[in-house]
From Swiss-Prot:
Disruption phenotype: No visible phenotype. The triple mutant kea4 kea5 kea6 is compromised in cell wall biosynthesis and has small rosettes, short seedlings, and is sensitive to low potassium K(+) availability and to high salinity (e.g. K(+), NaCl and LiCl); it also exhibits a reduced luminal pH in the Golgi, trans-Golgi network, prevacuolar compartment and vacuole. These phenotypes are partially suppressed by the cell wall-derived pectin homogalacturonan trigalacturonic GalA(3) in the dark but not in light conditions. It catalyses: K(+)(in) + H(+)(out) = K(+)(out) + H(+)(in). Induction: Up-regulated by low K(+) stress and down-regulated by high K(+). Pfam families: Na_H_Exchanger. This is K(+) efflux antiporter 4. Electroneutral K(+)/H(+) efflux antiporter involved in K(+) homeostasis and osmotic adjustment. Together with KEA5 and KEA6, promotes growth and development, and facilitates endosomal pH and ions homeostasis, as well as salt tolerance (e.g. K(+), NaCl and LiCl), probably by supporting cell wall biosynthesis during rapid etiolated seedling growth.
Length: 592
């Protein structure tokens, strides 16, 4: 009874702290919003005193920051740092037409060739392109790009099927895979993380480097399988008992982190004379961490089962779940939809998420075990069919999640969790692991291709300062949130440092905000360079974790046994949560 009472008191204290923090943040948020609205009203009142000829010009500038404000000083500094010619180095997706930009496609000029009816061709040429039809006329148009690649639009009247090869995609994939392998080998021989080698290799061969791969849309599409299989493997290793211990901080704590970043950025922008909407977007932008990169490091260091690893993974999963809500918020911030419409859109996304997870839960209890047993019986001699079925199941759930307006990442993780509830989770992981490693390397190399080394070198001073500021702020905010939920200093700092980068999904969020004209070009370039540089410095940040833990022990911030707990190889965590998990496992074994 006394233990239950202590747990209840501890939960009450955590709840009171959380409510107090939310009330304070909400108060400052509405205060800054009211302050910004009052400033806009004062500006409008000044405009009405002007003559009629200058009213239109004043209204156009009323939404801009106040003169001589801190935000105006920052704008002038950014205009000097990122002139207009930098737009050519890092193209803005918002400069394309809306249909192309929304689909994240590449706009390219091509020539459409429609031959004449009386044009004569050789027999071999007709046979290769299947040009022989009933009328003897070629009615299939061709497209020729700037590099003389020929694309057949359609071939409805061909007599015989011909395999059409995309040699451009094959050559690009060969370059990316070979360069990623060389980069990984070089960094492995130097005793450094291979992830850094993948990122650096991609930046060298990409458009910002030697330009071996100039058009990245096809490579990026194939590389997206890396994120899908990474999260699928993570779902296969999912443990409900371990996540149950950290769910109190992973779910409300993750939401609190996003809310805090949005509030702090919005308040800072308002007090400095900037736009409140830009500040809120920057907060949402900074709250996203790199799921693929962090998971890769945690897997390499065997830290998934650690306490800080479980909290980190839970927070990353929650961020993936919140992606749809953030996309619904962007039109509201950009002024393209009303507040009521934005709230309804977010409520719709939340309802779809709950219904989708509920349907998957029912399938995981009924259909999935039967399906896996069937595949096992059919794959008694070889695992080929079982491996193919596991991959197909992952892709199907991820595709359904994407079609419902959720994310591919959420669907692939949910597919892994569905299989983790069965007895074949470990067998499935062994079958999928080689595929995961291959596509993960391809994905990280494609992320490296987004990094323009020339652009980073020209603005390394301001971008490095921005990255250091992001690392410090994210580490402090995340550590405070974790500490509020009753965890020790060591766990809070480790979670903060693990999430102290900007995720690769922020590129998509940034592109969508640029299409909605939510941010200006100079801020777009600053955030783009900061995100790229933060991904490059993430391996170094993980290398510094043991040194930070050792320093914390010397300064008596952490317990003396923290340095042994953070050995990263076969890491165990010595906490009340770990003891509860071990007792639960021992009890289940004893009962069996």
């Amino acid at each position: 009874m006394r233990r239950c009472k202590n747990n209840t008191d501890k939960f009450s204290v955590i709840t009171m702290r959380l409510l107090t923090l939310l009330l304070i943040c909400t108060f400052f948020f509405f205060f800054s919003f009211a302050y910004s609205a009052e400033s806009d009203n004062e500006t409008d009142s000044v405009v009405t005193r002007e003559i009629n000829g200058t009213v239109v010009e004043s209204n156009a500038t009323s939404a801009k920051p106040r003169e001589d404000s801190f935000a105006d000083m920052i704008d002038r500094a950014l205009e000097k740092e990122f002139p207009d010619n930098d737009q050519n180095e890092v193209p803005d997706p918002g400069s394309f037409n809306n249909s192309v930009a929304d689909q994240q496609a590449v706009l390219e000029t091509v020539a459409r060739v429609k031959p004449k009816k009386n044009e004569t061709k050789t027999k071999e040429e007709k046979s290769f392109f299947n040009l022989d039809n009933e009328n003897g006329v070629e009615d299939t148009p061709r497209l020729i790009d700037r590099k003389d690649n020929v694309f057949i639009m359609s071939n409805p009247k061909s007599k015989y099927p011909v395999l059409q090869l995309d040699l451009r995609l094959i050559s690009d994939l060969v370059v990316v895979i070979v360069s990623a392998t060389c980069g990984g080998i070089a960094f492995a021989c130097a005793g450094q993380p291979v992830i850094t080698g993948y990122l650096l290799a991609g930046s060298i061969i990409g458009p910002g480097g030697l330009s071996f791969v100039s058009e990245m849309v096809q490579v990026e599409t194939v590389a997206q399988f890396g994120v899908i299989f990474l999260l699928f493997a993570l779902g296969l290793e999912f443990s409900a008992a371990k996540l149950r211990v950290v769910r109190a901080v992973a779910i409300p704590g993750g939401l609190l982190q996003i809310f805090l970043f949005m509030c702090l950025s919005g308040i800072t922008a308002s007090l400095c004379g900037g736009k409140l909407t830009e500040g809120i977007f920057v907060g949402a932008f900074l709250s996203m961490s790199s799921t693929a990169v962090v998971l890769k490091f945690l897997m390499e260091r065997n830290s998934i089962s650690a306490l800080h690893g479980q909290i980190t993974v839970g927070t990353l999963i929650l961020q993936d779940c919140a992606v749809g809500l953030l996309f619904a918020l962007l039109p509201v911030l950009g002024g393209t939809s009303g507040v009521l419409q934005g709230v309804l859109s977010m409520a719709k996304s939340l309802a779809i998420l709950i219904a989708f997870l509920g349907a998957l839960f029912v399938l995981s209890r009924t259909w999935v075990p039967w399906f896996l047993k069937l595949m096992t019986s059919l794959s008694s001699q070889t695992n080929e069919l079982y491996q193919l079925a596991a991959v197909a199941f992952c892709l199907l759930v991820a595709w359904c999640s994407d079609k419902l307006g959720l994310s591919l990442e959420l669907g692939s993780f949910a597919a892994g969790v569905m299989i983790s509830t069965t007895d074949l989770a470990q067998h499935t992981l062994e079958q999928v692991e080689p595929i995961r490693n291959f596509f993960a390397a391809l994905f990280l190399a494609s992320i490296g291709m987004l990094i323009h080394m020339h652009f980073l070198w020209n603005h390394v001073d301001i971008l490095l300062a921005a990255v250091l500021l992001v690392i410090v702020i994210k580490t402090v905010v995340v550590a405070i949130v974790v500490k509020v939920f009753g965890y020790n200093n060591k766990t809070a700092v480790l979670v903060g440092m693990s999430l102290a980068q900007i995720g690769e999904f922020a590129f998509v969020l940034l592109s969508r905000a640029s299409n909605l004209h939510l941010i200006e070009s100079k801020l777009y370039l600053l955030l783009l360079g900061t995100t790229a540089l933060s991904l490059v410095t993430t391996p170094l940040l993980f290398k510094l974790i043991p040194a930070v833990v050792h320093l914390g022990v010397l300064l008596r911030w952490f317990s003396p046994d923290s340095s042994t707990e953070i050995g990263f190889k076969g890491e165990l965590y010595h906490s009340e949560s770990a003891k509860r998990i071990s007792l639960m496992i021992q009890g289940s074994l004893h009962d069996s």
